């Protein structure tokens, strides 16, 4: 099969690798859509390798035996590999599994872990069925495009009465805006990139603040009647972002971190009575119907946030 390999700084090519083998509860999936996530850092920095991509949507083409899915099923491929046996996995929180398994150890195949490829393998319980009325493009957003911030909205209980502040309006932050807007919330963004800011405004974000502006916090306070945002989500991983959100979230408000940025002083958390949430991915045991309902209701916004589409042959 063909897979994408990074060969140098801003250089990549298609290379031939063996088709992945499956065993046990593993399933082989033909990749039809693979969103771009953090892999661009590796491309930009020139870190060589051919294990790229951790999310996808595609079609089941082979099972090793009786499985929860069938050949021909359309599925979203969940990221990571939980053990499937621990308390977290059994509760649908496989992303936090402390004893993840290595597909290589189970299937004996060096390929199949990456999604920038023609095929990948995944355990059957980590494949989410795609409803007939959703396209592969839209369904693929159930991973990092919408998933982490969907979890943040669930944890914080975002609704139409909230003003939600989102720091970082890249692919994950824009997904946060889509999630919050679908729930009827008013959204304020923090973003320095003009293209991303304009894209956010085009889907309904009320205002976008430049984090490099020394008056950024004051502008947020002005937009929230001097109180601060009801709920905040950090997606940028910028070192200063969590502290800014802690200052710009109202007392007794909620702050969810999707990004892996800098610290928040305990005095800010306690003094403002903030509830802090860590949000990495969504619970597909509990919330699959809600996730698909969100995708179904935000197709027009997703069509804007899916800015570019390329065949793998153009890599």
Q: What is the meaning of each model-derived region?
A:
Residues 19-34, 44-90, 131-133:
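Glycine-rich beta-strand-centered segment in the early N-terminal region that forms part
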Residues 125, 132-213:
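Mid-domain Rossmann-like dinucleotide-binding core that forms the NAD(H)/NADP(H) cofactor-binding site
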Residues 35, 64, 237, 259-260, ...:
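Short glycine-/small-residue-rich Rossmann-like dinucleotide-binding loops
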Residues 156-160, 198-275:
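Glycine-rich cofactor phosphate-binding loops and adjacent beta1-alpha1 units
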Residues 263-309:
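C-terminal substrate-binding/catalytic core of Rossmann-like NAD(P)-dependent dehydrogenases/reductases
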Residues 42, 83-167:
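NAD(P)H dinucleotide-binding glycine-rich loop of Rossmann-like/cofactor-binding domains
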